[in-house]
Amino acid sequence: MKHKIFSHTSLLIILSVVLTFLAAGTVMYNRYDIYMKQGVRDEAAYIKTGLEEDGRDFLTDKIGDATSSRITLLGKDGDVLFDSIENPSEMENHSDRPEFIEAEKKGFGEMVRYSDTLSKQTFYYAIKLKDDQVLRVARTTDSLLMTMLSSFLLLGGLVCVIFVIEFFLVQNQ
């Protein structure tokens, strides 16, 4: 009888912990995603204002140290004029990038896709400037997902502790 109680209780505990973890993780990821994207949009608006008021002098090599985002300035034709991570002269034309095309048409564009340069899933936000250049701000999006995956070790430890407590409670009945 104790074995049956232990088995059923164990199954319920595992299901409860895993489902709670997945639900909380999903809610956290969605909120993080919303805040991260809005943060990138706000950052792009700030940099756009700086570029339109001060010109290209606003962008320096030190801007990469001031933000976790990648900043890229693209010419009308998609040529890279500035990049906070890579040497622009070694970069290919970006005129075929979805966020660039959308920014050219609508004034802004955004896309989540894999970055070959960063080797990570990245959120890109592009905004057209008054001089028809395009400012693109990008931030990797996998940080919370990686945190959740690394949390599975903690989850496993938590389940083990619960099993030990449950085992002693069932044995003492």
Task: For the regions a language model picked out, list residue spans one by one.
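Membrane-proximal, non-catalytic sensory/regulatory domains of signal-transducing membrane proteins
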Residues: E53, E90-D131
